[in-house]
Design a protein with these regions (language model features):
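His/Asp/Glu-enriched short active-site or ligand-binding loop at hydrolase and phosphoryl-transfer sites
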Residues: 154-191, 230-241
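Charged helix-capping and loop-helix junction motifs
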Residues: 120-124, 180-185, 212-218
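A cross-domain feature marking catalytic cores of carbohydrate-active enzymes
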Residues: 53, 80-82, 104-106, 144-146, ...
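A short acidic, helix-capping loop that chelates divalent metal ions and anchors anionic groups
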Residues: 110-115, 173-175, 205-208
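Active-site beta->alpha N-cap acidic-glycine motif
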Residues: 27-111, 119, 123-130, 135, ...
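CE4/NodB-like, metal-dependent polysaccharide N-deacetylase domain
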Residues: 66-77, 101, 117-151, 155-163, ...
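Sec-dependent N-terminal signal peptides of Gram-positive bacterial secreted proteins and lipoproteins
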Residues: 3-22
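C-terminal domain-boundary segment and adjacent tail
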Residues: 25, 34-44, 72, 86, ...
Length: 255
């Protein structure tokens, strides 16, 4: 049911893409949100948030993150790199088994403002195929590396059956820079609001790193959410429960 909801969104967005003029990158968020092509956060009153992790799976940190999420009965969305999934398939199997969402973050973690549609399609397809071989399903969500987005990237994603997910602007603690765990947790909790999409990274440092500030911060973040009645759900779950997920002209609540 929830997957069908995402498909419906993509169909509506695809229709809008043919009816609404292409916007330049400089128009960015306002233009893309108006058409429903990109999601930064969700307009919802429920005290739910979507916590997301990019760049994994990591052989040490991702299992530690999964342990913490399980402790608090929280669900997350993992935007995985295909080349890492290929190396650590057992971790992805665990993520799926424990009810987390797997989303596409390209195969080789490519960041290129001049990327062609053909190259991006190949990156998405290769990652989709690996995920499907391991989990049995093809992801419907995609996050561009570094949040890099323009018309070509977004429209290519839509043409490949992907809804583009970014993150709430005030919910990026830049944990990849390895700040103190207390700074990461404070950054997230001080401004949290219902419908926020939170950006974190489960791949920090190298494959052989043994300590992650993100993992250290996560326990504190989860404790705060629990004490303040916030529930962590997947991105798709939050979209499904939102009344403001489709473009306004198609929204039955639109006035």
């Amino acid at each position: 049911m929830k997957k069908n909801w995402i498909v419906l969104i993509l169909l509506i967005v695809s229709f809008c893409s043919t009816q609404i003029p292409i916007y330049a990158f400089t128009n960015s968020r306002k233009a893309y949100e108006k058409t429903g092509k990109v999601i930064w956060e969700v307009n919802i009153k429920e005290k739910i948030v979507a916590i997301t992790f990019d760049d994994g799976p990591h052989p040490v940190f991702t299992p530690q993150i999964l342990d913490i999420l399980a402790k608090y009965n929280a669900k997350a969305t993992f935007f995985v790199a295909g080349n890492k999934v290929k190396r650590f398939p057992a971790i992805l199997k665990r993520q799926v088994k424990e009810g987390h969402e797997i989303a596409n973050h390209t195969y080789s973690h490519i960041y290129d403002k001049n990327i062609t549609s053909a190259k991006l399609t190949a990156e998405l397809d290769q990652t989709d195929e690996i995920i499907k071989q391991i989990s049995g399903y093809k992801p419907t969500l995609y996050r561009p590396v570094g949040g890099l987005h323009n018309d070509l990237i977004i429209n290519t994603a839509i043409q490949n059956g992907k809804l583009v997910i970014l993150w709430s602007w005030h919910q990026d603690p830049q944990d990849w820079r390895n700040p103190a765990a207390s700074k990461i947790s404070k950054y997230i909790t001080k401004g949290v609001k219902p419908g926020n999409i939170i950006l974190l990274h489960d791949w920090n440092g190298s494959e052989f790193s043994q300590s992650s500030q993100t993992v250290k911060a996560l326990e504190s973040i989860m404790r705060y959410f629990k004490n303040n009645d916030y529930k962590c759900v997947t991105v798709s779950e939050m979209l499904y429960r939102s009344i403001k997920v489709i473009p306004a002209p198609f929204d039955p609540f639109y006035q």
